[in-house]
Amino acid sequence: MSSIHCFTSASFAYLDRVRVLGETLKKHHPDWNFWLCLSDQEPDGFSFELDREPIDGIVRIEELGISSLQSWIFEHDVVELCTAVKGQMLVRLLEGGADKVVYLDPDIAVISDLTDIVNWLDDNDILLTPHQLIPDIKRKAIIDNEMASLAYGIYN
């Protein structure tokens, strides 16, 4: 088993994006294990066959060991929920034997090799990529971006 694991966190509404992420990740890193942390259940009548997906494994929110799960879920909207499970999923993969773990948002397409990230993890315990590096100056951008950063943080 590869010691490099990559995961994303999403609901079924984002499954199409997760597929693009998985397909493009596997194109550049076929030896990485790609995981989906799934925050909800399949809709009625939906058929989901893992062996036909570019995903090596799925961990459902119920498998993360979150205490009082139903009340915890109730406190979050779907975006917050997909964000809130990242820490527990990271711990699960590391405790499961992963040497290195990369998280990618589900709406990402990998367009080039990510080996530099893996190499940086040789010397660093964690790497963070902020949503913003340069302050916005236009009013609309400030409202859309700066206010969101104040509300949710630049790392989510």
Task: Describe each region flagged by the PLM.
Residues M1-N156:
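Glycosyltransferase catalytic domains, chiefly GT-A lineage
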